[in-house]
Amino acid sequence: GTLLLRFPIFYNSGKVVPFIDSLFTTVSAICVTGLSTVDMSVYTDAGFFVIMLLIEAGGLGLVSFFTIYLMFASKKISLLNRNIIKDYFTEDSQIEVRQIIKLIVCLTFGFQLIGGTVLAIFLKAHGEENFIFYGLFLAVSAFCNAGFAPYSDSLAQFAHSPEIYLVI
């Protein structure tokens, strides 16, 4: 991610992102902290795509890790709680890691697609030209709890648009 964000195609012309800032943005995206040492509007849509993929990888990694951890930790919890966890994830109580990961990925993408679609509709109503991509970017960022936004003012421009905040 760091090296990709260093290529001129990923940031706006006339603006150079120092290596340390590219590294910080990459780590922040993967760790889903949402911190940035640069104005996020410095990145192009291609740059936001890279950042979105990093957020997605970090978010899916965290959710998958904790789900698998709960599966194995359930061996140390009561029989009732173990059965609740098993029943929650599969009907036949035969938990397999691959099935759980597949379920997590499908649900994650499904929720993000729904959120992105709704956000795109609202962003279009607000005159955003790139409403589809920015809707998806915001949905991924919100779902993974990353807190990144593709605007220089974060989401302040939508301060009087509760519909956008409700979706996020």
Which residues are covered by each model-predicted region?
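Membrane-proximal intracellular helices of multi-pass ion channels
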Residues: 1-168
